[in-house]
Amino acid sequence: MAIVGLGTDIAEIERVEKALARSGVAFAERILSVQEMETFVSLKQQGRFLAKRFAAKEAASKALGTGIAHGVSFQDFTIKNDDNGKPYLQLAGRAAELAHQMGVCHTHLSLSDERHYAVATVIFES
């Protein structure tokens, strides 16, 4: 196995919270998948959840080498959690096509947050 993609992103939680307050659910719908929205609407700390998802999706798009462009959208990525709470990445659409072209067989996602920031790192392995 070899690393074929690496991406990292950091999001300021307060900035995401302000965007959410300004644009409401429309901002969240632009970033989150349908499955993620189902979780989002039930949370008290929506801004923190959204900041972590935003950072993860930006990191994943950087690992693809495209960023959120060239047909890759936030909706192409869904962040889920396994039975132990470990986050993992599910790809769809153009992101899945590009990952296949890169020979990606394994994805790794690390998420962390503290008072002011959320950070994510994504590694794609062939």
Curated annotation (Swiss-Prot):
Gene3D superfamilies for the chain: 4'-phosphopantetheinyl transferase domain
GO cellular component: cytosol
Domain of life assignment: Bacteria
Main location, first listed in the record: cytoplasm
EC number in record: 2.7.8.7
Protein task: Transfers the 4'-phosphopantetheine moiety from coenzyme A to a Ser of acyl-carrier-protein.
Recorded family membership: Belongs to the P-Pant transferase superfamily. AcpS family.
Entries under HAMAP family matching the protein: AcpS (MF_00101)
Protein name: Holo-[acyl-carrier-protein] synthase
Lineage, uppermost ranks: Bacteria, Pseudomonadati, Pseudomonadota, Gammaproteobacteria, Vibrionales
Gene: acpS
